[in-house]
């Protein structure tokens, strides 16, 4: 099915608009804005980009740790997105200015309760957006107040790169540097490249970083 996740996104948004699903005021406003944008001729929906990101995440990434509500271990199982996460991706990379390939949103603030996969989502966004924008030479930084928090996302991606056999040291396409000086991964592909690096917040040293994707974990805005 070409846009197989679109009905899921619409059902999620409709359930909030109708009141079937309990939601906070800000989420209700986000849903109303979403429906207004769909009817606004100033924007168009790029289903292909949104589906690319969703399917890249669900078909290449697996959980590194965690359990289901019933205690079933998640490690090694596919990283399947919840409807609200698909709604986020359709908004972020699907909605574009009319007659252009420019996304409407260049910044997102995502509030998620504790122990609901914020870091996994941050890493999944870094991975999928980096691949989506590979033709432009994508560069992504994941920053946190402490390097240890940034490494949660990096280690999640590193685990998956190794699991897929894509680490360059094993003959794969992704060069990984993971030592005391640097935590990064990069790949040059036939139609582009991407670079992802984990950083600790350091305003004195990071004022000149040049990237098209920036993710701050625990505060969780995404810029591109």
PLM-predicted stretches and their roles:
Residues 1-224:
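Phosphate/NTP-binding elements of NTP-utilizing enzymes
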């Amino acid at each position: 099915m070409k846009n197989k996740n679109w009905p899921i996104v619409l059902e999620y948004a409709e359930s909030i608009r109708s009141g079937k699903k309990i939601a906070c005021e800000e989420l209700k406003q986000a849903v109303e804005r979403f429906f207004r944008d769909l009817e606004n001729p100033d924007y168009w929906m790029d289903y292909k980009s949104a589906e690319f990101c969703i399917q890249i995440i669900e078909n290449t990434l697996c959980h590194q740790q965690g359990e289901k509500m019933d205690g079933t271990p998640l490690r090694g199982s596919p990283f399947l997105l919840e409807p609200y996460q698909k709604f986020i991706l359709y908004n972020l990379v699907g909605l574009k200015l009319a007659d252009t390939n420019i996304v409407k949103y260049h910044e997102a603030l995502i509030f998620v309760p504790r122990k609901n996969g914020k870091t996994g989502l941050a890493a999944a966004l870094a991975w999928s957006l980096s691949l989506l924008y590979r033709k432009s030479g994508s560069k992504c930084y994941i920053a946190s107040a402490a390097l240890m928090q940034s490494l949660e996302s990096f280690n999640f991606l590193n685990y998956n790169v190794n699991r897929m056999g894509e680490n360059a040291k094993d003959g794969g396409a992704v060069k990984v540097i993971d030592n005391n000086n640097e935590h990064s991964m990069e790949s040059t592909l036939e139609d582009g490249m991407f670079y992802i690096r984990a950083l600790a917040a350091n305003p004195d040293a990071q004022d000149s970083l040049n990237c098209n994707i920036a993710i701050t974990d625990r505060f969780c805005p995404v810029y591109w």
